[in-house]
């Protein structure tokens, strides 16, 4: 009898704990721009890791981008571990993109590469030209 009473609170705790996790319920939209950026950043490899920049996953997200997306949301919805998830990486990209209202694909890609002022940094033009090449081709997503 004592064991039965202990199992119920433990079960109840796990149900409650799963509700504490603050999920971002955004549709996962993957379009030509995202697919192209994934090809440039990682070749579409969700396990890609650049130790020099601590950039992770298919979109090569650095810790500063996770912090920025959480700042835009006003809460800590994403962790550094989420960078390994293709779906969560795309969500983070789409959140940043949604805050760049009216931006062209070029501005979005160059901002993704160089930060908020990236579209004005000459070095990000080469990045954009690579992305643009992929947006104009048929990319097979992994």
What are the functions of these language-model segments?
Residues 28-30, 52, 103-105:
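Extracellular/periplasmic catalytic domains that process cell-envelope and extracellular macromolecules
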Residues 19-27, 136-142:
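Extracytoplasmic and endomembrane cell-envelope/extracellular-matrix remodeling and assembly machinery
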Residues 28-45, 61, 93, 108-116:
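Short, functionally critical alpha-helical segments immediately adjacent to catalytic or ligand/cofactor-binding
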Residues 63-120, 128-137:
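Alpha-helical segment that forms one wall of the substrate-binding/catalytic cleft
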Residues 125:
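Active-site-proximal loop/helix of nucleotide/amide-processing enzymes and allied scaffolds
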Residues 38-73:
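Secreted/periplasmic proteins that engage bacterial cell-wall peptidoglycan
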Residues 3-14:
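Sec-dependent N-terminal signal peptides
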Residues 46-47, 119-122:
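Extracytoplasmic/secreted cell-surface and envelope-processing proteins
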């Amino acid at each position: 009898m004592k064991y039965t009473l202990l199992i119920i609170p433990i079960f109840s705790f796990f149900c409650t704990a799963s509700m504490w996790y603050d999920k971002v319920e955004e549709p996962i939209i993957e379009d030509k721009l995202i697919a192209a950026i994934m090809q440039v950043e990682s070749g579409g490899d969700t396990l890609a890791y650049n130790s020099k920049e601590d950039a992770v996953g298919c979109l090569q997200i650095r810790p500063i981008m996770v912090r920025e997306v959480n700042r835009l949301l006003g809460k800590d919805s994403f962790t550094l571990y989420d960078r390994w998830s293709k779906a969560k990486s795309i969500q983070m990209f789409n959140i940043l993109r949604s805050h760049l209202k009216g931006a062209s694909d070029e501005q979005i890609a160059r901002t993704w590469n160089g930060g908020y002022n990236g579209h004005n940094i000459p070095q990000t033009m080469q990045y954009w030209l690579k992305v643009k090449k992929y947006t104009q081709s048929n990319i097979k997503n992994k």
